[in-house]
Amino acid sequence: SARALSGFGGAVSTPAIQWYPGHIAKAEQQLKRHLDKVDLIIEVRDARIPLSTGHPHLNRWIHGKHHLLVINRRDMVTPAAWEAWEQWFKAQGQRTVWCDAKSGTGVKQVQQAAIRAGNQLNERRRNRGMRPRPVRALTLGFPNVGKSALINRLVKKKVVASARRAGVTRTLRWVRLGQDLDLLDAPGVLPPRLDDQRAALHLALCDDIGQAAYDGELVAQAFLRLLLGLKSREGAGVVLSILEERYGTPVAGRTADPAFWLEATAERHTSGDKARMAQRLLDDFRRSLLGSIALELPEKVVS
């Protein structure tokens, strides 16, 4: 639930962010057609925003199926952040496997967990007098959370188009992962309406929705507000001095106001072009050049 989130540094005041292009709507229709054919759902989320990248319809889709929750981009947050989330999910009765598809960290554990789930499914088939068969798994998640990069790691060669951009995978395709597991790489799916605008902002910051959906300057300002709210949170990984050293503008006094900070930094770096400066700030965050920053942290773990 969104109540698990904390440390947001005030209200987020950006115009409503909505993004549901035709190819996403089509992807959801394709996905629903294939759900009956799969035994295992491998859900992939983003470690920086593990709640915002959870699809609200997921429980409806995974009903009666094995569900493996993979949190990708582990290397982009602090160990304290992912350990806190691991405990939080455990308290909800949900085991998680953490990995980083780009560096390969934890990918073997994902593979082992998927094969284990497959073995359990085939054991159940045997007990019912049915013959074992390769398990059919579906990777599911928001656009740009790294599903295709993870599949490429799992099969150890590039078989699926993969790029850091929302909506690169447009069609469904099967990939053989060992002799006992077939994987279906599905395009990213989003809810038709982004009702939780705080989550929508996080998706925009992590480049999980198309740039046409939001105003870059306003999202950059909201990002700065978010950092100010998170800086005192243990595990968030916000170090304002990195920002100040990189851009030469202190986050204090008058320039502690995000609009003034963006204006002053644009004067220094982009000839006063605030839109270009906003894009640079967002790109730097997305490439981890501002440190390992978790935009979402669990409120507390109830033991």
Report the location of each language-model feature.
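Helix-rich effector regions associated with P-loop NTPase G domains
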Residues: 2-41, 48-49, 54-68, 74, ...
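Short beta-strand/turn micro-motifs composed of small residues
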Residues: 45, 71, 141
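A structural signal for isolated positions on well-ordered beta-strands in alpha/beta enzyme cores
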Residues: 68-69, 138
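Canonical P-loop GTPase G-domain recognition
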Residues: 77-139
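Conserved active-site beta-strand-loop modules that form the wall/rim of enzyme catalytic pockets
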Residues: 101, 151, 181-184
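Short, structured loop/turn "capping" segments at alpha-beta junctions
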Residues: 121-125, 152, 158-164, 231-235
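Short coil/loop residues immediately preceding or within conserved phosphate-binding loops
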Residues: 132-135, 157, 172
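Glycine-rich phosphate-binding P-loop
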Residues: 137-156, 186
